[in-house]
Amino acid sequence: VVVTLASGLEMCDTTTDGGGWTIFQ
């Protein structure tokens, strides 16, 4: 699941990182 925020950042729901959210610029 990838969510694009209003600021243009992308949050990726990944199970490889403790099931947390990783933020990409």
From Swiss-Prot:
Localization per record: Secreted
A GO molecular-function descriptor: carbohydrate binding
Main localization of the protein described in the UniProt heading: secreted
Domain of life: Eukaryota
Flavoprotein recorded as keyword: no
GO cellular component: extracellular region
Induction notes from the record: By infection.
Tissue: Hemolymph.
InterPro entries attached to this UniProt entry: Fibrinogen-like_C
Function: Binds and precipitates antigens of the parasite Echinostoma paraensei.
Signal peptide boundaries: none
Native species: Biomphalaria glabrata (Bloodfluke planorb)
Protein name, UniProt field: Hemolymph 65 kDa lectin BG01
Keywords: Lectin, Secreted
Oxidoreductase among keywords: no
Gene: BG01
